[in-house]
């Protein structure tokens, strides 16, 4: 079974609140749809909208003509005494999707015409369009209401037009009111009454049933369906292209010709152009949908792929990921280590897992990019004795005033308090500790020689921060690091690790020698 997909991202999708594609964005999306995804048909505009829309449509049609795609370009037209026909013809397009009324209410109250008058207008428009070489598809706007509440109107309209030069009769669920059982019933009625006609189904997602209704429509033999990238469209949107393609391929066993492994790329580009973010859990294209969080799932994947289904991420140009968090367990850690090419013994994996759990209490998810930093943090500091601990600290930052740090630390079991101002919050923190060491402990405090902040790639504001600080202690260089989602906390961790190194006399020589090998602590 072949199901023809018509993408209306550039027409109906642009009717999403707050979305307006620039001309070059529309041209870019059209190229992606036709040449990367291999969409059979795309609806690019509504006739007579604006001068800018006309220039875009004309430029796109010129490109499509050169690339052999011109018959795949469609433009929405209206019953306006031939004005839409001329607009579309002068753009260079070959197909007009003519909007007529698919319910008696729309015909009576919006057009204020009888069905006979409406039929005559449609026939005259079809005749004019054919005279200038345009092909016609016919939208029955509000068909879902019409077939439920005024079926005789719908059948009267269809009986009068079934022998006209119409390529496709397109059945919109304009207000998104149908459920799958109703879609089956009404589409089947149309197919049985008019078996020789070609029908498209056009879903809207008001009840979150657009994909299910599209699926139901194809079960009745409907030959074409309409979608948009990321489900863009009026109100709750249209049927999302990626979900519809997957359902047609896997559940209908239909052929669409769509290149599945390009859908994620196209989705991301349209997301960027539209400014409408894709939900993380949106099927197939959401950021998290191919991420296993539970450790038992990762363990099952290690044992004959027990938690796989037909929606393999590679089908859609993506990769499976294993989340690092409090529920992930060692199986998830192992999966991520494999992907990074890192091998650790069981005891090290146990320590890394414990650290991931600790971090996940502060951060919703630890990313794979964070993992090398965590490993370095855990394995390089596992033997440092905890002679110095931070009991509490307060950092104040106020407009026009110097930052203030108030701290309480424990050194060898005894608590000390200190406070200081500084040029920054960390500077104030270090000066407060230096006061404690000099004034209360009578000890030398190392001087800071270098301070480096590393943030894993990805650009997330909640990414783990690795802070590496170099210290000069009596002519010896120490290098310590901290790791946290908060940059200040990471710097404080690095500072406390340094203090523990110099406090632990038994291991100080060993750690000081690490500098000579290029290692950092």
Describe these PLM feature segments:
Residues 477-479, 483-506:
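Mixed-charge, glycine-accented linear interaction segment located at domain edges/termini
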Residues 2-3, 7-9, 253-419, 459-464:
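A mid-to-C-terminal "edge-of-domain" accessory segment
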Residues 510-517:
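Conserved small/polar residues in nucleotide/adenosyl-binding loops
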Residues 1-80:
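N-terminal capping/small domains of soluble enzymes
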């Amino acid at each position: 079974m072949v199901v023809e997909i018509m993408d209306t991202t550039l027409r109906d999708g642009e009717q999403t609140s707050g979305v307006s594609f620039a001309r070059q964005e529309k041209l870019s999306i059209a190229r992606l749809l036709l040449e990367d995804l291999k969409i059979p048909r795309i609806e690019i505009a509504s006739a007579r909208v604006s001068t800018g829309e006309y220039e875009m449509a004309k430029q796109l049609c010129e490109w499509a003509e050169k690339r052999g795609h011109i018959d795949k370009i469609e433009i929405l037209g209206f019953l306006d005494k031939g004005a839409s026909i001329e607009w579309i013809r002068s753009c260079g397009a070959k197909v007009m999707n003519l909007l007529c009324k698919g319910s008696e209410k729309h015909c009576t109250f919006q057009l204020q015409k009888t069905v006979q008058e409406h039929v005559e207008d449609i026939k005259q428009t079809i005749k004019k369009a054919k005279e200038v070489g345009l092909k016609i598809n016919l939208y029955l706007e509000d068909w879902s209401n019409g077939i439920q509440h005024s079926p005789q109107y719908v059948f009267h309209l269809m009986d009068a037009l079934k022998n006209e030069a119409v390529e496709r009769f397109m059945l919109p669920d304009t207000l998104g009111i149908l459920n799958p059982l109703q879609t089956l019933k009404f589409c089947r009625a149309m197919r049985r009454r008019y078996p020789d006609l070609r029908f498209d189904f056009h879903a809207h997602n008001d009840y979150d049933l657009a994909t299910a209704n599209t699926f139901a429509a194809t079960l009745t033999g409907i030959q074409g369906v309409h979608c948009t990238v990321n489900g863009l469209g009026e109100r709750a949107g249209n049927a999302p292209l990626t979900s519809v393609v997957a359902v047609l391929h896997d559940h209908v066993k239909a052929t669409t010709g769509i290149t599945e492994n390009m859908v994620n790329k196209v989705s991301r580009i349209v997301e960027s152009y539209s400014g409408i973010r894709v939900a993380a859990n949106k099927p197939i294209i959401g950021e998290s949908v191919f991420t296993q969080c539970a450790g038992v799932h990762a363990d099952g994947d290690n044992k004959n792929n027990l938690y796989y289904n037909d929606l393999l991420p590679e089908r859609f140009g993506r990769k499976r990921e294993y989340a690092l968090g409090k529920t992930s367990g060692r199986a998830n850690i192992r999966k991520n280590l494999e992907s990074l090419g890192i091998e650790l013994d069981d005891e090290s994996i146990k320590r890394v897992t414990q650290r991931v759990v600790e971090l996940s209490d502060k951060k919703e998810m630890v990313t794979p990019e964070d993992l090398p930093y965590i490993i370095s943090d855990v394995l390089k500091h596992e033997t440092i004795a905890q002679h110095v601990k931070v009991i509490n600290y307060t950092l104040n930052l106020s407009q026009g005033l110097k930052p203030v740090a108030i701290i309480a630390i424990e050194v060898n079991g005894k608590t000390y308090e200190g406070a200081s101002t500084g040029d920054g919050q960390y500077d104030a923190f270090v000066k407060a500790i230096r006061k404690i060491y000099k004034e209360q402990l009578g000890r030398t405090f190392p001087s800071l020689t270098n301070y480096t902040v590393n943030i894993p790639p990805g650009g997330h504001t909640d990414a783990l921060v690795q802070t590496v600080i170099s210290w000069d202690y009596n002519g010896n260089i120490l290098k310590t690091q901290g790791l946290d989602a908060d940059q200040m906390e990471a710097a404080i961790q690095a500072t406390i690790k340094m203090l523990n190194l110099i406090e632990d006399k038994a291991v100080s020589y060993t750690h000081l020698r690490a500098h000579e090998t290029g290692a950092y602590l």
